[in-house]
Amino acid sequence: MKMKQFNLLSLFLILITSFGSANSTIVSHDERAITIDGQRRILLSGSIHYPRSTSDMWPDLISKAKDGGLDTIETYVFWNAHEPSRRQYDFSGNLDLVRFIKTIQSAGLYSVLRIGPYVCAEWNYGGFPVWLHNMPDMKFRTINPGFMNEMQNFTTKIVNMMKEESLFASQGGPIILAQIENEYGNVISSYGAEGKAYIDWCANMANSLDIGVPWIMCQQPHAPQPMIETCNGFYCDQYKPSNPSSPKMWTENWTGWFKNWGGKHPYRTAEDLAFSVARFFQTGGTFQNYYMYHGGTNFGRVAGGPYITTSYDYDAPLDEYGNLNQPKWGHLKQLHTLLKSMEKPLTYGNISTIDLGNSVTATVYSTNEKSSCFIGNVNATADALVNFKGKDYNVPAWSVSVLPDCDKEAYNTARVNTQTSIITEDSCDEPEKLKWTWRPEFTTQKTILKGSGDLIAKGLVDQKDVTNDASDYLWYMTRVHLDKKDPIWSRNMSLRVHSNAHVLHAYVNGKYVGNQIVRDNKFDYRFEKKVNLVHGTNHLALLSVSVGLQNYGPFFESGPTGINGPVKLVGYKGDETIEKDLSKHQWDYKIGLNGFNHKLFSMKSAGHHHRKWSTEKLPADRMLSWYKANFKAPLGKDPVIVDLNGLGKGEVWINGQSIGRYWPSFNSSDEGCTEECDYRGEYGSDKCAFMCGKPTQRWYHVPRSFLNDKGHNTITLFEEMGGDPSMVKFKTVVTGRVCAKAHEHNKVELSCNNRPISAVKFASFGNPSGQCGSFAAGSCEGAKDAVKVVAKECVGKLNCTMNVSSHKFGSNLDCGDSPKRLFVEVEC
């Protein structure tokens, strides 16, 4: 009987193994490309970070990425989110990594899993848990036994989770590549010989995990074998792998840029982004990933920096809420379709490059069956008229023309035929003003007068070491006794604090002295305010506030946070200055604020504390206050936002779930923006910035899954700086207007994102000019009324498609042979 059971079990295991092998995918590489089941592939990937959206959003985001022409989704794995306390793991909700990978698989796409576990990503502390920093003798990202043990433990856990669910391609899953470490080549020189030894250890450790697919290391020249090195940046056309047997791969094509509090809004044109992609494939690239394809939202306190905003929109092809960012999404989709059609020549063809002069080159990829060509003009100012294979081509400055058959131009990166969608905020049907209740941050007086804390230490301690990043807030409290005989005593005294707190609030004897906010990245500063002291005991309470922990740079984990001192009382007696250093005094430390500790934002806890919420005398501009209001969820399925204009700084919760930090009172500089953006020339994060002199972030994403469709919802605010909640409003995000520019002999497609096209505001066929919202007819017009033509085709429809031709819009002899274009603006 036992033998029979053994034989049946053995047969079952053999069948399972055979089934797994039959469905497995062999992923490898050669010098040209990643190979899948022995075939070289063009792979088009996009970054979607699972914790920066909700699990309900994942299918739609992935579907839109697929519709946009991607075949691969890339994500980091966020260590501090999954292991907030040592050996205590969280893979629930939007941290359900397995579910995310399976959602990718269900869509028929591949996945790239960047385990790191250092991620940078403008994520708090670069993805490292702060408890790791607080372990004895700890140093990150170098030969350090404690760090290496913890890194290997987490990496192994993630790998085993993927293996248990058969998610690697070698098991029949979607994961075709995995990444160990991240951009270490940018900092390796700071670590000396130990840096080289560490990266070798990373490679050996990763390779020992036997995942059955290749490992990559981004920004890692001369990566240890068998790791594949890759490129990150705005452009990687000039990149060449150090290892001649490695393919040319681009793991981060930055589609825009992130925002800092106090910073302007970044914008990278569709023309320039498409140019960077086409140039990369023209010069031999075969794998390209958009960072980000969907940026999303830094919910809760996950934003890093310091000073990274709650919005992580990144000007990506899918905006923060999951809408198509047009024309970027559509312009890239057209390019992706062509690149996929050219896959065989690009991966197997012989390559020849022809210099056509004045920074223009033609590249021919040729097989026996097919040839495909690119004509690239990297001149940032001059258009080019070139003759190639006996035909003339007009190639605008800073653009690439794509010729799938080496004869007819099918696409040019500078000629955008895709619509531009103007996203607007639509007011909801709710009453304009919410009915608020409020309460102060209770027992604050106990803290600032008595110095009652959680920890007592002699001297000043770094904020990370005390809080373990459990809170943005840490009280530093001490007492000092003064009498008339004290040498420092005078009528003119001040408090001087050398600080690395991102925001500092100071109290002396229960009185608020003032605050200091870091501006222009000057995180090491001196705070000094005049104070009124008394004979006897004086109480000092300093509230240090962090706004995201540093996430990048060599040894960034040891960068100071909080009040590092010295802290001094300064007495001025005529020309004489006398200082009393309090840095080595006994200090009391209190982690967090009482409202946070009692979870006033929680739906379970908020109504059960002994202090009631008040409905009377709603205060404005009151520091350290809590506000709460009920509201109904906006109707429909459009994304929901909350307008926090009028508030100062703090955190906001919807039904107990944090949607992030807010700071609408922090405006960007009045300088550095441009009214018109020239796509030509190299892009940088400051180029084409807009929204100068405006709040860095005014609107905050409220995921639909956070809301109750029926009944009441609750918004809770903690206001740190003082603001007016009466101006807070909920709105939905909709496509308000759509514009399009299309060259003759192309098609124009218009869509209002599931809303009907209601009217044609402008249409002209000929030589119109201007930008969306300010189009103007030119000197040459088609014979037919373009507005009527477009209205007949489009009004009342969710979308419409038209051929742009003289036959459709009428010819006009006055236009001559000059190229004609159609400009259209419709209302939704």
Curated annotation (Swiss-Prot):
Domain called SUEL-type lectin: residue spans: 742-828
Main localization (coarse): secreted
Annotated EC: 3.2.1.23
A Pfam entry, by short name: SUEL_Lectin
Compartments where found: Secreted, Extracellular space, Apoplast
Database matches in InterPro entries: BetaGal_gal-bd (IPR048913), Galactose-bd-like_sf (IPR008979), GHD (IPR041392), Gly_Hdrlase_35_cat (IPR031330), Glyco_hydro_35_CS (IPR019801), Glycoside_Hdrlase_35 (IPR001944), Glycoside_hydrolase_SF (IPR017853), Lectin_gal-bd_dom (IPR000922)
Any one GO biological process: carbohydrate metabolic process
Signal peptide (residue range): 1-20
PANTHER family named in the record: BETA-GALACTOSIDASE RELATED
Record protein name field: Beta-galactosidase
Species assigned in the record: Brassica oleracea
Lineage: Eukaryota, Viridiplantae, Streptophyta, Embryophyta, Tracheophyta
